[in-house]
A protein has these predicted regions:
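An acidic-aromatic substrate-binding cleft motif
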Residues: 38-55, 60
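Short, solvent-exposed turn/loop segments enriched in Gly/Ser/Thr/Pro and often Arg
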Residues: 84-94
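Alpha-glucan (starch/glycogen) binding determinants
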Residues: 1-35, 74, 97-100
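Conserved phosphoryl-transfer catalytic core
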Residues: 121-148, 155, 159
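Aromatic- and acidic-residue-enriched segments that line the glycan-binding/catalytic groove
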Residues: 93-123, 185, 194-201, 205-211
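Conserved, mostly hydrophobic/aromatic
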Residues: 75, 85, 193
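Short, acidic/polar
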Residues: 64-72
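Conserved small/polar residues in nucleotide/adenosyl-binding loops
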Residues: 221-222
Length: 224
């Protein structure tokens, strides 16, 4: 740009656009699928694996974000450049195994709670409850195949207990405030939908007796 010269030119024939007869306020957009430059195509070795398959001794019956971090560290140590995973967005509709299809998400922003690394969320002070989850962890990890419903039920039980223990502190923290302000545009509707979905026992908002038509001020009364 500073030298006012082109670094490279496309190799394909020139594009032609017939003189269109556009009406006032009309816009014509021509989109080409490819651009043709003599630029070497980047190549890199990598691995394709779904996060739920990364189960380790630290997991709770399913691979989680902690396991993904360990996978990334391994990929770096073996000089791999790419890790391809399946979608990890929240697909929760009925809390049943039918929610396990990764391509049927309810949000393009929210991650599936199942992938949360429990060990990174804090330790339960209730020793009896902590012992119960340690036992459940071994049971879930020992299964020959992932039990979607059992995993999610266990993790949600932990989420509620750790929120009861640490929730007030987290909600009052500056870090949460920054996260909330940066993401509230999608976070609030997602939270309200999730609450109403469970309250009315269906993800089909058309069947809800109330709030079936989106109204932010009214709907947000359900937020804490």
């Amino acid at each position: 740009k500073e030298e006012k010269k082109a670094d490279c030119w496309e190799n394909n024939p020139n594009r032609y656009l017939a003189d269109p007869e556009l009406k006032t306020n009309e816009t014509l957009v021509i989109s080409d699928r490819y651009a043709y430059f003599d630029i070497p195509v980047w190549k890199g070795a990598g691995i394709a694996i779904p996060v739920f398959s990364l189960k380790s001794e630290n997991s709770f019956g399913v691979g989680d974000f902690g396991d993904l971090k360990r996978m990334i560290d391994w990929a770096v140590s073996t000089q791999q450049k790419v890790i391809q995973i399946l979608p990890i967005n929240d697909t929760t509709m009925t809390h049943a195994w039918t929610d396990s299809y990764p391509y049927n998400s309810i949000s393009i922003y929210a991650f599936h709670p199942m992938y949360a690394d429990i060990k990174q969320m804090g330790t339960l002070k209730d020793k009896s409850a902590a012992a119960k989850f340690n036992k459940k962890q071994k049971e879930l990890n020992g299964l020959p195949a992932m039990d979607y419903e059992a995993v999610n039920q266990t993790k949600w039980e932990y989420f509620r207990l750790i929120f009861k223990q640490e929730g007030e502190k987290v909600l009052a923290s500056g870090e949460f405030g920054e996260f909330f302000n940066a993401n509230k545009e999608w976070l609030q509707p997602y939270a309200v939908f999730s609450y109403l979905r469970d309250a009315f026992q269906t993800p089909n908002f058309r069947e809800w007796p109330r709030h079936s038509v989106y109204n932010a001020p009214v709907s947000y009364t359900h937020l804490r």
